[in-house]
Protein backbone atom coordinates (compact mmCIF):
# COMPACT_ATOMS: atom_id res chain seq x y z
CA UNK A 1 0.00 0.00 0.00
CA UNK A 2 2.78 2.41 0.96
CA UNK A 3 4.75 1.50 -2.15
CA UNK A 4 1.71 2.07 -4.37
CA UNK A 5 1.19 5.55 -2.88
CA UNK A 6 4.87 6.38 -3.29
CA UNK A 7 4.95 5.01 -6.83
CA UNK A 8 1.96 7.06 -7.93
CA UNK A 9 3.56 10.25 -6.61
CA UNK A 10 6.95 9.39 -8.14
CA UNK A 11 5.40 8.96 -11.57
CA UNK A 12 3.74 12.37 -11.32
CA UNK A 13 6.74 14.34 -10.04
CA UNK A 14 10.44 14.13 -10.86
CA UNK A 15 11.22 15.88 -7.58
CA UNK A 16 9.39 13.22 -5.58
CA UNK A 17 10.92 10.47 -7.74
CA UNK A 18 14.43 11.67 -6.92
CA UNK A 19 13.64 11.99 -3.22
CA UNK A 20 11.98 8.60 -2.88
CA UNK A 21 13.88 6.46 -5.42
CA UNK A 22 16.24 4.96 -2.85
CA UNK A 23 13.55 4.53 -0.19
CA UNK A 24 11.21 2.89 -2.69
CA UNK A 25 13.94 0.54 -3.91
CA UNK A 26 14.79 -0.45 -0.34
CA UNK A 27 11.17 -1.09 0.58
CA UNK A 28 10.53 -2.97 -2.66
CA UNK A 29 13.63 -5.10 -2.19
CA UNK A 30 12.54 -6.02 1.34
CA UNK A 31 9.08 -6.99 0.06
CA UNK A 32 10.42 -9.03 -2.87
CA UNK A 33 12.98 -10.69 -0.60
CA UNK A 34 10.16 -11.84 1.68
CA UNK A 35 8.24 -13.24 -1.29
CA UNK A 36 11.36 -15.06 -2.47
CA UNK A 37 12.10 -16.51 0.96
CA UNK A 38 8.56 -17.84 1.33
CA UNK A 39 8.76 -19.34 -2.15
CA UNK A 40 12.09 -20.94 -1.27
CA UNK A 41 10.70 -22.39 1.96
CA UNK A 42 7.87 -24.00 -0.01
CA UNK A 43 9.93 -25.22 -2.98
CA UNK A 44 12.69 -26.67 -0.81
CA UNK A 45 10.09 -28.25 1.50
CA UNK A 46 11.84 -26.77 4.53
CA UNK A 47 8.83 -27.21 6.82
CA UNK A 48 8.42 -30.87 5.83
CA UNK A 49 12.13 -31.50 6.40
CA UNK A 50 12.02 -29.83 9.80
CA UNK A 51 9.04 -31.96 10.79
CA UNK A 52 10.96 -35.07 9.81
CA UNK A 53 13.91 -33.86 11.87
CA UNK A 54 11.67 -33.25 14.88
CA UNK A 55 10.04 -36.67 14.51
CA UNK A 56 13.48 -38.32 14.47
CA UNK A 57 14.47 -36.27 17.51
CA UNK A 58 11.33 -37.31 19.41
CA UNK A 59 11.99 -40.99 18.58
CA UNK A 60 15.61 -40.67 19.74
CA UNK A 61 14.53 -39.06 23.02
CA UNK A 62 11.92 -41.77 23.65
CA UNK A 63 14.61 -44.47 23.52
CA UNK A 64 16.31 -43.41 26.76
CA UNK A 65 14.90 -42.47 30.18
CA UNK A 66 17.61 -39.88 30.85
CA UNK A 67 16.96 -38.23 27.50
CA UNK A 68 13.26 -38.11 28.32
CA UNK A 69 14.07 -36.31 31.55
CA UNK A 70 16.22 -33.67 29.83
CA UNK A 71 14.62 -33.32 26.39
CA UNK A 72 11.17 -34.85 26.79
CA UNK A 73 9.29 -31.55 26.85
CA UNK A 74 11.39 -29.64 24.32
CA UNK A 75 9.09 -29.89 21.29
CA UNK A 76 5.98 -29.16 23.38
CA UNK A 77 7.75 -26.12 24.84
CA UNK A 78 8.55 -24.78 21.37
CA UNK A 79 5.05 -25.43 20.06
CA UNK A 80 3.53 -23.72 23.09
CA UNK A 81 5.82 -20.70 22.73
CA UNK A 82 5.26 -20.18 19.01
CA UNK A 83 1.52 -20.86 19.15
CA UNK A 84 0.87 -18.49 22.05
CA UNK A 85 2.93 -15.66 20.52
CA UNK A 86 2.02 -15.94 16.82
CA UNK A 87 -1.05 -13.67 16.92
CA UNK A 88 0.74 -11.02 18.99
CA UNK A 89 3.73 -11.22 16.65
CA UNK A 90 1.45 -10.59 13.67
CA UNK A 91 -0.12 -7.58 15.38
CA UNK A 92 3.31 -6.18 16.28
CA UNK A 93 4.36 -6.58 12.66
CA UNK A 94 1.33 -4.64 11.45
CA UNK A 95 2.03 -1.79 13.88
CA UNK A 96 5.73 -1.74 13.09
CA UNK A 97 5.30 -1.83 9.32
CA UNK A 98 2.47 0.72 9.29
CA UNK A 99 3.94 3.27 11.66
CA UNK A 100 7.63 2.75 12.45
CA UNK A 101 8.41 1.78 8.83
CA UNK A 102 5.36 3.26 7.10
CA UNK A 103 4.32 6.81 7.89
CA UNK A 104 7.63 8.67 8.15
CA UNK A 105 6.27 11.36 10.45
CA UNK A 106 5.99 8.74 13.20
CA UNK A 107 9.64 7.82 12.70
CA UNK A 108 10.57 11.51 12.88
CA UNK A 109 8.60 12.02 16.09
CA UNK A 110 10.21 8.92 17.59
CA UNK A 111 13.69 10.22 16.78
CA UNK A 112 12.95 13.52 18.51
CA UNK A 113 11.38 11.80 21.52
CA UNK A 114 14.50 9.67 21.97
CA UNK A 115 16.72 12.68 22.68
CA UNK A 116 17.75 13.37 26.28
CA UNK A 117 17.57 17.15 25.97
CA UNK A 118 18.57 17.96 29.55
CA UNK A 119 21.39 15.42 29.58
CA UNK A 120 22.91 16.32 26.21
CA UNK A 121 25.51 18.97 25.47
CA UNK A 122 24.92 21.57 22.73
CA UNK A 123 27.55 19.79 20.66
CA UNK A 124 25.72 16.46 20.99
CA UNK A 125 22.46 18.10 19.94
CA UNK A 126 24.17 19.60 16.88
CA UNK A 127 25.57 16.20 15.93
CA UNK A 128 22.13 14.62 16.29
CA UNK A 129 20.57 17.28 14.07
CA UNK A 130 23.29 16.90 11.45
CA UNK A 131 23.26 13.08 11.42
CA UNK A 132 19.53 12.44 11.74
CA UNK A 133 17.20 15.38 11.17
CA UNK A 134 18.92 17.07 8.24
CA UNK A 135 19.12 13.85 6.16
CA UNK A 136 15.46 13.12 6.98
CA UNK A 137 14.19 16.36 5.43
CA UNK A 138 16.52 16.04 2.43
CA UNK A 139 14.38 13.23 1.00
CA UNK A 140 10.97 13.90 2.50
CA UNK A 141 7.64 15.08 1.12
CA UNK A 142 5.07 15.92 3.80
CA UNK A 143 2.02 15.92 1.51
CA UNK A 144 2.90 12.43 0.31
CA UNK A 145 3.50 11.19 3.84
CA UNK A 146 0.10 12.53 4.88
CA UNK A 147 -1.51 10.17 2.35
CA UNK A 148 0.57 7.29 3.66
CA UNK A 149 -0.44 7.99 7.26
CA UNK A 150 -4.15 7.94 6.38
CA UNK A 151 -3.74 4.65 4.52
CA UNK A 152 -1.71 3.08 7.33
CA UNK A 153 -4.26 4.11 9.95
CA UNK A 154 -7.00 2.52 7.88
CA UNK A 155 -5.31 -0.82 7.26
CA UNK A 156 -4.29 -1.21 10.91
CA UNK A 157 -7.89 -0.60 11.97
CA UNK A 158 -9.00 -3.30 9.52
CA UNK A 159 -6.37 -5.90 10.43
CA UNK A 160 -5.69 -5.45 14.16
CA UNK A 161 -8.16 -6.56 16.88
CA UNK A 162 -9.82 -3.63 18.66
CA UNK A 163 -8.29 -4.54 22.03
CA UNK A 164 -4.77 -4.27 20.57
CA UNK A 165 -5.19 -0.97 18.72
CA UNK A 166 -3.19 2.03 19.97
CA UNK A 167 -5.28 4.35 22.16
CA UNK A 168 -5.06 7.07 19.50
CA UNK A 169 -7.78 5.20 17.60
CA UNK A 170 -10.30 6.02 20.33
CA UNK A 171 -9.59 9.71 19.79
CA UNK A 172 -9.85 9.35 16.00
CA UNK A 173 -13.18 7.53 16.30
CA UNK A 174 -14.59 10.11 18.71
CA UNK A 175 -13.22 13.38 17.30
CA UNK A 176 -12.91 12.51 13.60
CA UNK A 177 -15.66 9.86 13.32
CA UNK A 178 -13.12 7.36 12.02
CA UNK A 179 -12.13 9.61 9.10
CA UNK A 180 -8.41 8.84 8.80
CA UNK A 181 -7.79 11.29 5.98
CA UNK A 182 -9.23 14.08 8.10
CA UNK A 183 -7.15 12.97 11.09
CA UNK A 184 -3.95 12.79 9.02
CA UNK A 185 -4.61 16.25 7.59
CA UNK A 186 -5.03 17.61 11.11
CA UNK A 187 -1.81 15.98 12.33
CA UNK A 188 0.20 17.50 9.50
CA UNK A 189 -1.48 20.89 9.91
CA UNK A 190 -0.92 21.19 13.66
CA UNK A 191 2.39 19.42 14.24
CA UNK A 192 5.46 21.54 14.93
CA UNK A 193 8.04 18.97 13.83
CA UNK A 194 7.85 19.43 10.06
CA UNK A 195 10.49 22.15 10.19
CA UNK A 196 14.20 21.62 10.78
CA UNK A 197 14.45 25.00 12.52
CA UNK A 198 11.55 24.18 14.85
CA UNK A 199 13.15 20.89 15.83
CA UNK A 200 16.55 22.50 16.38
CA UNK A 201 15.00 25.22 18.55
CA UNK A 202 13.01 22.64 20.50
CA UNK A 203 16.00 20.40 21.22
CA UNK A 204 18.06 23.34 22.45
CA UNK A 205 15.37 24.61 24.84
CA UNK A 206 14.01 22.18 27.48
CA UNK A 207 10.89 24.34 27.98
CA UNK A 208 10.02 24.16 24.29
CA UNK A 209 10.85 20.46 24.24
CA UNK A 210 8.39 19.84 27.08
CA UNK A 211 5.58 21.08 24.82
CA UNK A 212 6.30 18.16 22.49
CA UNK A 213 3.96 16.03 24.62
CA UNK A 214 1.00 17.91 23.16
CA UNK A 215 2.17 17.64 19.56
CA UNK A 216 -0.19 15.39 17.52
CA UNK A 217 2.66 13.58 15.77
CA UNK A 218 4.38 12.89 19.07
CA UNK A 219 1.05 11.79 20.56
CA UNK A 220 0.63 9.27 17.74
CA UNK A 221 4.19 8.00 18.07
CA UNK A 222 3.87 7.51 21.82
CA UNK A 223 0.52 5.74 21.45
CA UNK A 224 2.03 3.26 18.98
CA UNK A 225 5.08 2.64 21.16
CA UNK A 226 2.92 1.97 24.22
CA UNK A 227 0.92 -0.61 22.24
CA UNK A 228 4.10 -2.29 21.04
CA UNK A 229 5.44 -2.37 24.61
CA UNK A 230 2.19 -3.93 25.85
CA UNK A 231 2.41 -6.59 23.14
CA UNK A 232 5.99 -7.27 24.17
CA UNK A 233 4.82 -7.80 27.74
CA UNK A 234 2.15 -10.25 26.56
CA UNK A 235 4.73 -12.36 24.71
CA UNK A 236 7.37 -12.40 27.46
CA UNK A 237 6.54 -15.90 28.72
CA UNK A 238 6.21 -17.22 25.17
CA UNK A 239 9.64 -15.95 24.15
CA UNK A 240 11.11 -17.45 27.33
CA UNK A 241 9.65 -20.84 26.34
CA UNK A 242 11.04 -20.45 22.81
CA UNK A 243 14.52 -19.48 24.03
CA UNK A 244 14.62 -22.38 26.49
CA UNK A 245 13.23 -24.82 23.93
CA UNK A 246 15.71 -23.78 21.24
CA UNK A 247 18.63 -24.07 23.65
CA UNK A 248 17.65 -27.60 24.72
CA UNK A 249 16.74 -28.67 21.18
CA UNK A 250 20.12 -27.60 19.84
CA UNK A 251 21.89 -29.33 22.73
CA UNK A 252 19.90 -32.48 22.00
CA UNK A 253 20.73 -32.40 18.28
CA UNK A 254 24.43 -32.11 19.09
CA UNK A 255 24.12 -35.14 21.34
CA UNK A 256 22.05 -37.00 18.74
CA UNK A 257 24.51 -36.28 15.92
CA UNK A 258 27.94 -36.03 17.64
CA UNK A 259 29.78 -36.42 14.33
CA UNK A 260 27.82 -33.64 12.61
CA UNK A 261 29.03 -30.03 12.58
CA UNK A 262 26.05 -27.91 13.66
CA UNK A 263 26.25 -24.14 13.31
CA UNK A 264 25.10 -21.93 16.15
CA UNK A 265 22.73 -19.01 15.54
CA UNK A 266 25.05 -16.16 14.57
CA UNK A 267 22.28 -13.69 13.72
CA UNK A 268 23.06 -10.06 14.68
CA UNK A 269 26.71 -10.94 15.34
CA UNK A 270 29.99 -10.20 13.65
CA UNK A 271 30.90 -13.34 11.79
CA UNK A 272 33.01 -14.75 8.99
CA UNK A 273 30.93 -16.78 6.57
CA UNK A 274 32.19 -19.71 4.54
CA UNK A 275 30.60 -21.24 1.49
CA UNK A 276 31.10 -22.14 -2.13
CA UNK A 277 30.15 -20.73 -5.50
CA UNK A 278 27.81 -22.96 -7.46
CA UNK A 279 24.62 -23.38 -9.44
CA UNK A 280 21.14 -23.96 -8.09
CA UNK A 281 18.26 -26.32 -8.89
CA UNK A 282 15.06 -24.39 -8.00
CA UNK A 283 12.66 -27.14 -9.03
CA UNK A 284 12.50 -30.36 -11.07
CA UNK A 285 14.18 -30.27 -14.49
CA UNK A 286 15.45 -26.70 -14.03
CA UNK A 287 18.99 -25.50 -13.41
CA UNK A 288 20.37 -22.03 -12.71
CA UNK A 289 24.02 -21.62 -13.65
CA UNK A 290 26.36 -20.11 -11.10
CA UNK A 291 26.89 -16.89 -13.06
CA UNK A 292 25.05 -14.45 -15.33
CA UNK A 293 26.33 -12.64 -18.41
CA UNK A 294 25.52 -9.51 -20.36
CA UNK A 295 22.97 -11.52 -22.36
CA UNK A 296 20.68 -11.50 -19.35
CA UNK A 297 20.48 -7.71 -19.50
CA UNK A 298 18.92 -7.87 -22.95
CA UNK A 299 16.61 -10.71 -21.91
CA UNK A 300 15.28 -8.77 -18.92
CA UNK A 301 15.49 -5.21 -20.30
CA UNK A 302 12.09 -3.56 -20.69
CA UNK A 303 11.82 0.12 -21.73
CA UNK A 304 8.26 0.26 -20.37
CA UNK A 305 9.30 -0.76 -16.84
CA UNK A 306 11.24 1.67 -14.67
CA UNK A 307 12.73 -1.29 -12.79
CA UNK A 308 14.10 -2.95 -15.95
CA UNK A 309 14.81 0.09 -18.11
CA UNK A 310 18.45 0.41 -19.21
CA UNK A 311 20.08 3.54 -20.61
CA UNK A 312 20.44 3.24 -24.43
CA UNK A 313 24.12 4.20 -24.17
CA UNK A 314 24.74 1.24 -21.84
CA UNK A 315 22.99 -1.12 -24.25
CA UNK A 316 25.11 0.19 -27.13
CA UNK A 317 28.31 -0.36 -25.15
CA UNK A 318 27.29 -3.93 -24.34
CA UNK A 319 26.40 -4.64 -27.98
CA UNK A 320 29.92 -3.58 -28.99
CA UNK A 321 31.27 -6.52 -26.92
CA UNK A 322 34.45 -4.59 -26.24
CA UNK A 323 34.96 -6.21 -22.83
CA UNK A 324 38.74 -6.34 -22.98
CA UNK A 325 40.40 -8.26 -20.13
CA UNK A 326 37.03 -8.78 -18.43
CA UNK A 327 35.70 -11.13 -21.14
CA UNK A 328 35.73 -14.87 -20.43
CA UNK A 329 37.05 -17.47 -22.89
CA UNK A 330 33.74 -17.35 -24.78
CA UNK A 331 33.85 -13.57 -25.11
CA UNK A 332 31.10 -13.07 -22.53
CA UNK A 333 31.04 -10.53 -19.70
CA UNK A 334 30.28 -12.39 -16.46
CA UNK A 335 28.34 -10.13 -14.12
CA UNK A 336 26.86 -11.84 -11.05
CA UNK A 337 27.43 -15.17 -9.33
CA UNK A 338 25.65 -17.41 -6.84
CA UNK A 339 27.07 -18.70 -3.57
CA UNK A 340 25.67 -20.60 -0.60
CA UNK A 341 27.43 -18.60 2.10
CA UNK A 342 25.70 -16.11 4.36
CA UNK A 343 26.33 -12.41 3.72
Residue ranges: model-predicted function:
Residues 1-343:
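Terminal presequence/propeptide segments associated with secretion/organelle targeting
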Amino acid sequence: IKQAIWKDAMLKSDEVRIKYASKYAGSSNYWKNSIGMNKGLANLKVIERKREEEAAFAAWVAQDAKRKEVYGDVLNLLEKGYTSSSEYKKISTYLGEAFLSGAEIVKLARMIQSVDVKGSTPEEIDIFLEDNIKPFFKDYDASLDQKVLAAMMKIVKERVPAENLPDIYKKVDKKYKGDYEKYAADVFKKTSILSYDNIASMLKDPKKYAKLKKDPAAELSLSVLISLFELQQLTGDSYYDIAKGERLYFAGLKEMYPEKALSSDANFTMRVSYGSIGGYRPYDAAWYDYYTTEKGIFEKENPESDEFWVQPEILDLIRSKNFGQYANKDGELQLCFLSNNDI
